[in-house]
């Protein structure tokens, strides 16, 4: 300290504070409340020494006034020019009470907290996991020599932040040991016993299916019961409830069994009807498309039969064309036919030399018209359908006789 500072400490503290909080300098309008001293003395030794003396070396009253002044000095800086009146503590109060503005919260100045002397303190520190439980707490000395860490062993995996810390107990250790230990052969644990007691899914499904449906024994009807049921079915396929009950009483059956029998009987009847209709359709189409085909021997026998042409078969030129012994030009000679219509002669030739059957004659006759088929074809009449049938039967009989004669001659 210099000499001026020592002299300033010897001054009266009350005079210095009165000069600082002088109401004369604050009563002027527009003047700053911080200008209690002249501009040259603001940072002088007198102001600084007075403030230091009031804070550290003054009496209690001076320190209280100085502390209140410090708060009032901070208030105008925060709230603005409207709070200047609160800085002046010596402003006379008016006689009439004025409405006071709502008190504004004053920010608390953060005072530096005095730190106590450094003392060694204990704090919990989580040690490395998977340490064997030893039941002892280890005290570690820090590098500074005034702090120590209390190491607590853990028995589980490292947990993330926010997970609750589980204290080690005998159950957890026992569970881990039983899980990590090798199971002996033939020894079942509690979980194995529980799983063996529970049924498998397949067995459970089978038991549920058996419980869900009851298999009914097949009803065997006697001949008397079947006869009575068939009698009623012949009358009606759909008996009503009253008829079924009467039938059940006669046959010593239940009404439900009678109803089921009629359902099955109707299904069987529909199946038979459908099968019968299919058979009828098949037989109808098979008979409709079958054609009476004659063999070559039958055709030759019909042509050689004299009754096929008429009485005067010897004078007819047709056998000359059919029989292979006669020459073919005899059929084509112009003098072979007696004078007659050319259309009738052409029709006669085509009908005989075509297929040699009645089908060719009928078609060719219809082709040339009814006029060509005159009652006498070259003086000969054509026999009807019954003659052809009898001729075919006669030919078959002749064949049978020839066959029997050949067999008898061979023996």
UniProtKB/Swiss-Prot annotation:
Gene3D superfamilies: Homeodomain-like
Taxonomy, superkingdom: Eukaryota
Alphabetical list of InterPro entries matching this protein: HD, Homeobox_CS, Homeodomain-like_sf, OAR_dom, Paired_Homeobox_TFs
Keywords, alphabetical: Activator, Craniosynostosis, Developmental protein, Disease variant, DNA-binding, Homeobox, Nucleus, Phosphoprotein, Transcription, Transcription regulation
Signal peptide from the UniProt entry: none
Annotated motif OAR, positions: 391-404
Region feature (Disordered): 75-145, 184-219
CDD domains: homeodomain (cd00086)
Compartment(s): Nucleus
One Pfam family of this chain: Homeodomain
Subunit structure: Binds DNA.
Record disease entry: Parietal foramina 2: Autosomal dominant disease characterized by oval defects of the parietal bones caused by deficient ossification around the parietal notch, which is normally obliterated during the fifth fetal month. PFM2 is also a clinical feature of Potocki-Shaffer syndrome. Frontonasal dysplasia 2: The term frontonasal dysplasia describes an array of abnormalities affecting the eyes, forehead and nose and linked to midfacial dysraphia. The clinical picture is highly variable. Major findings include true ocular hypertelorism; broadening of the nasal root; median facial cleft affecting the nose and/or upper lip and palate; unilateral or bilateral clefting of the alae nasi; lack of formation of the nasal tip; anterior cranium bifidum occultum; a V-shaped or widow's peak frontal hairline.
Protein name according to UniProt: Homeobox protein aristaless-like 4
Species annotation: Homo sapiens (Human)
